[in-house]
């Protein structure tokens, strides 16, 4: 079998309704500044990032014989800057739209081939882009009617089907910690109550793993959260249950 592109939106889609007013900004790459606030609490800053815009499209889902219409919200990636006019005026016509092409490649093909390093990077970027857009959208909807984060898990439930959207756990932790300034223990409690997970296979080739260097390059703040989750998991769970079994602890550690 040979895979070929299907330009199914060539003539538009009457069932998809674009919602540019609900676009979301997604940060990628960059670095983390380690700083504390006036009270001495750790307040890292994710800076020098590349920005990508997520444009939502709503697909109406109508139940048979029902009076309710739900919407499946899909996301299209757009570069935050469509044209670098300074580069264009200097004669760099191709380079001037490079950011536009790179941004739009994120949502061009679902699950890009990850046999190359660039393919792995694009797949990680794509997975993060979709969950970041969706979580920001969920939070903005929640905040329209509620300002009590304790009620968040009662109003919002996220089902993770397989490993592809698992980075959503880290993104919600980042939002709670860095944006909403919630303490770690409270944020982790909210996250654990918000997410449900279904694993569809135990085959090693189907369970995703990411190199630390790649993850740190694309999502530098999120790798810090992974390491802290792992540190607490090892100290509070594994070493309490198997204090003398170092081999088991290494095998069950999130970070290799």
List each model region and its residues:
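A conserved ligand/cofactor-binding region detector
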Residues: 1-256
């Amino acid at each position: 079998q040979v895979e070929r592109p299907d330009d199914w939106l060539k003539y538009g889609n009457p069932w998809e309704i674009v919602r540019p007013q609900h676009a979301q900004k997604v940060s990628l790459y960059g670095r983390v500044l380690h700083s504390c606030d006036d009270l001495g609490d750790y307040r890292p800053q994710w800076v020098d990032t590349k920005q990508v815009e997520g444009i939502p499209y709503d697909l109406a889902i109508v139940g048979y014989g029902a009076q309710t219409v739900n919407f499946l919200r899909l996301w299209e990636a757009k570069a935050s800057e469509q044209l670098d006019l300074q580069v264009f005026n200097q004669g760099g016509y191709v380079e001037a739209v490079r950011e536009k092409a790179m941004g739009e490649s994120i949502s061009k093909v679902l699950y890009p081939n990850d046999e190359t390093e660039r393919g792995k990077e694009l797949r990680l970027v794509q997975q993060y882009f979709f969950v970041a857009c969706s979580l920001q959208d969920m939070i903005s909807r929640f905040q329209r009617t509620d300002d009590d984060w304790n009620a968040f898990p009662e109003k919002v439930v996220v089902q993770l089907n397989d490993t592809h959207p698992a980075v959503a756990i880290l993104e919600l932790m980042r939002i709670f910690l860095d944006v909403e300034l919630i303490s770690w223990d409270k944020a982790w409690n909210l996250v654990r109550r918000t997410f449900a997970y279904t694993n569809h296979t135990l085959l090693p080739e189907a369970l995703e793993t990411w190199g630390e260097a790649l993850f740190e390059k694309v999502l530098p703040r999120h790798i810090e959260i992974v390491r802290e989750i792992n540190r607490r998991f090892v100290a509070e769970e594994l070493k309490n249950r198997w204090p003398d079994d170092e081999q088991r602890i290494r095998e069950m550690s999130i970070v290799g």
